[in-house]
């Protein structure tokens, strides 16, 4: 049986942490930033963990990654 393919889009968007959790980037930070406050943009920096309700979908897109 052939290997399962990883979704290319998911490979670029998610990183698996050593503990098995998955980190992702924040949304709403690409464009239309002039109307957003500095505080709002600052809070959108950095990465956050994928919520547990979405982990099944993310794990299906990233087979063989230990999720």
From Swiss-Prot:
User: Keywords for this entry?
Assistant: Ribonucleoprotein, Ribosomal protein
Q: Name one GO cellular component term.
A: cytosolic large ribosomal subunit
Q: Which GO terms describe its biological process?
A: translation
Region (Disordered) residue spans: 1-23
MF-aspect GO terms: structural constituent of ribosome
Identify one Pfam family in the record: Ribosomal_L35p
Source organism per UniProt: Variovorax paradoxus (strain S110)
Q: Which domain of life is it from?
A: Bacteria
Family listed = Belongs to the bacterial ribosomal protein bL35 family.
Which InterPro entries does UniProt cross-reference here?
Ribosomal_bL35 (IPR001706), Ribosomal_bL35-like (IPR021137), Ribosomal_bL35_CS (IPR018265), Ribosomal_bL35_sf (IPR037229)
NCBIfam families noted in UniProt: rpmI_bact (TIGR00001)
Q: What is this protein called?
A: Large ribosomal subunit protein bL35
Q: Which Gene3D superfamilies match?
A: 4.10.410.60
Composition bias of kind Basic residues appears in 1-16
């Amino acid at each position: 049986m052939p290997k399962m393919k990883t979704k290319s889009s998911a490979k670029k968007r998610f990183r698996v942490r050593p503990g098995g959790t998955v980190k992702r980037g924040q949304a709403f930070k690409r464009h239309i930033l002039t109307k957003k406050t500095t505080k709002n943009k600052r809070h959108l920096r950095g990465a956050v963990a994928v919520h547990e309700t979405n982990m099944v979908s993310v794990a299906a897109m990233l087979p063989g990654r230990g999720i």
